[in-house]
């Protein structure tokens, strides 16, 4: 996951202009400035905690925000808010498939917030990438199995209606 996120940040850094902010615990890859200004914040070193880092992120006028791992509802709230304000938000979440990732996101929130959440996801989600390392036939290594789900009118409609299991079909 970390290597894939680092590759996405590096691609953006090489092929676009702007400001990339990473919030990590710990910083795993150092990104030098290329076409973008890259500000890397390590929780506990550069910022007191996740909450403080996330709260101060928009003050730095980023174009891209890498949030590391989403572990709780508060962090997910920030990710959605960043996406709603037009920022590209990259993060990881433990899940075995795109469907499971969407279910995990939904389950962070209480029932009374679900309809708004589904609408927000349907409008702001751009892609989900699910990765698993599987053993090779010879058992002498592992090979990645990658699922990429891009948002489309059909996916957005299924998410909006809460028909997440149908996405697999």
Which ranges hold each PLM region?
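Short, flexible helix-loop junctions that flank or precede catalytic/ligand sites
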Residues: 1-169
């Amino acid at each position: 996951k970390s290597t894939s996120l680092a590759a996405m940040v590096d691609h953006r850094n090489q092929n676009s202009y702007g400001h990339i902010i990473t919030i990590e615990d710990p910083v795993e890859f150092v990104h030098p400035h290329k076409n973008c200004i890259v500000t890397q914040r390590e929780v506990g070193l550069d910022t007191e905690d996740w909450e403080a880092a996330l709260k101060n992120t928009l003050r730095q006028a980023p174009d891209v925000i890498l949030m590391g791992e989403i572990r709780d509802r508060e962090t997910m709230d920030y990710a959605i808010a960043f996406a709603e304000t037009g920022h590209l938000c990259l993060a990881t979440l433990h899940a075995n498939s795109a469907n499971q990732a969407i279910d995990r996101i939904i389950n962070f929130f209480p029932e009374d917030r679900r309809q708004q959440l589904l609408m927000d996801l349907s409008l702001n989600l751009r892609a989900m990438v699910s990765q698993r390392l599987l053993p090779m036939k010879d058992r002498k290594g592992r090979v990645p199995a990658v699922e990429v789900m891009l948002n489309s009118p059909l996916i957005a409609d299924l998410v909006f209606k809460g028909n997440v299991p149908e996405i697999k079909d």
